[in-house]
A protein has these predicted regions:
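Core segments of cupin and vicinal oxygen chelate
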Residues: 2-3, 10-52, 90
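Short amphipathic alpha-helices within nucleic acid-binding modules
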Residues: 21, 82-87
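Vicinal oxygen chelate
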Residues: 3, 7, 32-34, 41-44, ...
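Conserved short beta-strand elements that form part of the metal-binding/catalytic scaffold
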Residues: 29-69, 117-124
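Helix N-cap motif at beta-to-alpha junctions
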Residues: 14-15, 79-82
Length: 131
């Protein structure tokens, strides 16, 4: 059986503010922003080159029952972490120092406006279509 990870819900306090951060600061692509029913909003954003998206919204248990800021360490894999950090800093994102943990693996951390944390990850041996 084959399965694909499609969506990771991200709990936020203000959908518009979070959407702006992910699209304008992190460069995610807006795939969906719909209000399919009264009191329900679904926003789906995808990092460029990724098959998996993040979701945020209101009026659904996946969004309303999780406390904002509780997602920790969602990994964003990049080919060149120094370049990615420089680009994000240039867009006004606070990014922690790059940490080389050995074995060709490097990490850097950042947070969205609600305190959900994201981890930039570079694995020098995992490039191209493999990451």
């Amino acid at each position: 059986m084959e399965m694909k990870l499609e969506l990771v819900p991200i709990p936020v306090t203000d959908v518009d503010h979070a959407k702006t951060f992910y699209v304008e600061r992190l460069g995610f692509v807006e795939d969906v922003d719909v209000q399919p029913a009264a009191g329900v909003r679904v926003v789906q954003l995808t990092p460029a080159g990724s098959a998996c998206s993040i979701g945020m919204g209101t009026g659904l248990p996946a969004y309303d029952e999780m406390a904002p800021g509780t997602i920790k360490g969602l990994h964003l894999v990049v080919a060149d972490i120094e370049q990615a950090c420089a680009e994000l800093v240039g867009r006004g994102v606070e990014v922690g120092a790059v940490e080389d943990v050995g074995g060709g693996v490097k990490y850097a951390w950042l947070a969205d406006p609600d305190g959900n944390t994201l981890t930039l990850q570079e694995m020098s041996w995992r490039t191209g279509d493999k990451f």
